[in-house]
């Protein structure tokens, strides 16, 4: 969202919203199922779906145990996919309603794809939307800002982000504890600070 960084040590950090990530609003629904299937996380790239403003179209499904009532377990099936690009000049509205259009898109995807979907369709138990960030190259950024190593990044959703977030958190914890992790594809790069002076 909107932040201010006072930098007394290193190059100025560009705080524009889209410097390292592009903002989108992602829409998800969740359904309670019997706990008779294992946990899963799957991405789908339907061939018959129009390309979105973000340049890709995919749906994602996660299934995991969930305890709604005490000592009564269900599978929580979460499905997302529809997105709307968030221009830099526009603020994300947390309280805006869940669009019927996106609910219909998710329901159509579930009816066509999810084998456990009942014949009369699945009724959503939960609906929500949230701000998501995508890096320009599709690869998560984890580690110190090259021009100002006091700023640590763990940026980029780029699909199902649960496991990469955990991995990123572990790398950040190593940096904070004084250990320098081995170089990886996730290291932030900024050629301004890598050129010889």
PLM features: residue spans?
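Short, solvent-exposed loop/turn segments that connect beta-strands within catalytic domains
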Residues: 37, 66-74
């Amino acid at each position: 969202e909107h932040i201010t960084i006072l930098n007394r040590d290193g190059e100025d950090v560009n705080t524009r919203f889209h410097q390292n990530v592009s903002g989108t609003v992602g829409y998800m629904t969740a359904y309670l199922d019997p706990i008779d299937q294992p946990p899963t996380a799957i991405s789908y790239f339907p061939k018959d779906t129009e390309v979105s403003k973000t340049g890709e179209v995919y749906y994602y499904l996660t299934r995991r145990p969930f305890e709604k009532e005490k000592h009564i377990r269900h599978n929580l099936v979460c499905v997302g996919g529809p997105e709307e690009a968030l221009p830099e000049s526009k603020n994300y509205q947390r309280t805006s309603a869940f669009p019927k259009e996106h609910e219909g898109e998710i329901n159509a995807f579930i009816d066509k794809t999810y084998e456990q979907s009942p014949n009369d369709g699945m009724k959503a138990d939960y609906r929500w939307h949230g701000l998501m960030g995508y890096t320009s190259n599709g690869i998560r950024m984890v580690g110190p800002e090259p021009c100002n190593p006091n700023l640590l990044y763990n940026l980029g959703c780029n699909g199902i982000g649960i496991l990469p977030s955990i991995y990123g958190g572990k790398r950040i914890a190593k940096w904070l504890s004084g250990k320098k992790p081995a170089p990886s594809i996730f290291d932030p790069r900024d050629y301004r600070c890598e050129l010889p002076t």
